[in-house]
Swiss-Prot record:
Lineage: Bacteria, Pseudomonadati, Chlamydiota, Chlamydiia, Chlamydiales
Keywords: Isoprene biosynthesis, Manganese, Metal-binding, NADP, Oxidoreductase
Transmembrane segments: none
GO biological process per UniProt: isopentenyl diphosphate biosynthetic process, methylerythritol 4-phosphate pathway involved in terpenoid biosynthetic process
Name of the protein described by the UniProt record: 1-deoxy-D-xylulose 5-phosphate reductoisomerase
Binding site for 1-deoxy-D-xylulose 5-phosphate: K122, S148, E149, S173, H196, S209, N214, K215, E218
Family assignment from sequence similarity: Belongs to the DXR family.
Amino acid sequence: MKHLALIGSTGSIGRQVLQVVRSIPDTFIIETLAAYGRNQEALISQIREFNPRVVAVREETTYKELRKLFPHIEILLGEEGLVSVATEPSVTITIVASSGIDALPAVIAAIRQKKTIALANKESLVAAGELVTTLARENGVQILPIDSEHNALFQCLEGRDSSTIKKLLLTASGGPLRNKSKEELQKVSLQEVLRHPVWNMGPKITVDSSTLVNKGLEIIEAFWLFGLEAVEIEAVIHPQSLVHGMVEFCDGTILSVMKPPSMLFPIQHVLTFPERSPAIGPGFDFLSNRTLEFFPIDEDRFPSVHLAKRVLLEKGSMGCFFNGANEALVHRFLAGEISWHQIVPKLQALVDQHRVQSCLSLEEILSVDAEARARAQEC
């Protein structure tokens, strides 16, 4: 049996994690849950179904309600509760299914307790890649990627000699605005931005997909996750979203992972790793998917990927600043304070102004993140 901690249980990834757990009986035990969203009814339902030892929440009203409903379960509040969920002694795999930097202290604590990390939280690596990966190496901890593209690369790289690897290729659907001209992009609406052609995701990541900032974040994440210093990391537009990642080797061979655009596949792969279990949904059908298209990213319309590569080259505090500033700008767009076409220019201006510093501690990282968000609110 695998004993799981699940951070972000009521979000999109968290719910799909539990779907996989249900589909493979007698394999997993949900030891702890953390839900920092406002979907109290969903969390109550999960607690009744999985009967975890410990539950952590952010809202005090939810905390009080859960203590009344479940007196036999340890209910915790705030960041300390999140860390407790991630580091519960009975847990062997800590699944980080939430988005945002709020999960970073729990990720670091779980690594120090030598928990295997199943990671769907790209912010942890973008903002604190050096700290997280250094701690993982020192503690002999494996980080298993849940993000579809990184999971595909992980499968292609498994057991390979790193000296034979030439290039990592991440695919991007192109987002909801991929076919719009530069002029049309000046006046897109919130409704257009949130209408993703392939994936059903939360609003923040859907906006990131529309600007292609998400792909830039994934390039940074891939650098820290796989630690291949001399290997080129590129992104290409693949509208069908059937090829999720490719690895090119020195002899010209390219390996890829192909599957339907569903997060259930990478989640199941990570939870059952290193074993494999029968798929819980239909797999890839070559006969009904005869067309696979690949296009270069138009950097004139979508300059964010180039900006992210620059951020990666500068390292230090730049990834943390880039991530925090982008998140604040996206929230301003969702609140109607700025237009879509202002997000990336404002982000670039903020990056240009940031003075890179070393970020070796959690406290330094959180300080830079707070600075980035404050600056993004003012610009």
